[in-house]
Amino acid sequence: MLKVIDHPLIKQKLSVIRSQKAGHDVFRKNVIEIASLMTYEVFRNYKLKEIKIDTPVAQDVLAYDYDKEIVIVAILRAGLAMVPGIVNLLPKARVGHIGIFRDEKTFEPNNYFYKIPDVPKDSEILIVDPMLATGNSAVYAIERLKKDGFKNIRLLSLVGVQEGVDNIEKNVGKDFPIFLGSLDEKLNDKKYIVPGLGDAGDRIFGTK
């Protein structure tokens, strides 16, 4: 279930990081800001529980708090850059990590690290990765989390292509929630998104 978050601030900031002139400092800053902006829409339907609090002038006032644990799962390494923008709005959220690298010949995912907080299986899980290209890494992450018993899982990426969306819908289900800032045109022969962002990990961390 694809949702492209159409917002002028997201469009403008995506334009900044699409430019090859953007250095790693500018790129990283805008990735954080875009992730923060997109968080509003991702958690639009998140259910809160009612609590009672005392204000400076009243007692037993109706208020709201988290109903379920929230876990942000960053796909390493590029997904790390999105975490600060999200936890800035969700400070109680826990953070997990899945290390995946793509084989440059087969384009298949290889897992080298997996660490998820010990939380109830009905927790809200948000996988974050700036790019949804082939979708193979996302499918691996989703299936690994489902194997561990998690059910409430969604994916947040800055940009993606239909091929990646189709891969998830085919292997996970058409109702799986996917949130993108932009649905780009296609993948090139090296499986890079076009027009895309280039190698998001290298651009975030200033490496090549």
Swiss-Prot record:
Pathway participation: Pyrimidine metabolism; UMP biosynthesis via salvage pathway; UMP from uracil: step 1/1
CDD domains given in the database record: PRTases_typeI
PANTHER family (alphabetical): ADENINE PHOSPHORIBOSYLTRANSFERASE (PTHR32315), URACIL PHOSPHORIBOSYLTRANSFERASE, CHLOROPLASTIC (PTHR32315:SF4)
Residues annotated as binding uracil: I193, G198, D199, A200
One GO biological process term: UMP salvage
UniProt superkingdom: Bacteria
Catalytic activity: UMP + diphosphate = 5-phospho-alpha-D-ribose 1-diphosphate + uracil
Cofactor names: Mg(2+)
Keywords: Allosteric enzyme, Glycosyltransferase, GTP-binding, Magnesium, Nucleotide-binding, Transferase
Classification via HAMAP family: Upp_B
Cofactor binding note from Swiss-Prot or TrEMBL: Binds 1 Mg(2+) ion per subunit. The magnesium is bound as Mg-PRPP.
Record entry for activity regulation: Allosterically activated by GTP.
Free-text function comment from the UniProt entry: Catalyzes the conversion of uracil and 5-phospho-alpha-D-ribose 1-diphosphate (PRPP) to UMP and diphosphate.
EC annotation from Swiss-Prot or TrEMBL: 2.4.2.9
Protein name listed in UniProt: Uracil phosphoribosyltransferase
Molecular function as annotated in GO: GTP binding; magnesium ion binding; uracil phosphoribosyltransferase activity
Similarity comment: family membership: Belongs to the UPRTase family.
The protein's enzyme class: transferase
Stored InterPro entries: PRibTrfase_dom (IPR000836), PRTase-like (IPR029057), Upp_B (IPR034332), UPRTase/APRTase (IPR050054), Ura_phspho_trans (IPR005765)
Binding site for 5-phospho-alpha-D-ribose 1-diphosphate: R77, R102, D129, P130, M131, L132, A133, T134, G135, N136, S137, D199
Record-linked Pfam families: UPRTase (PF14681)
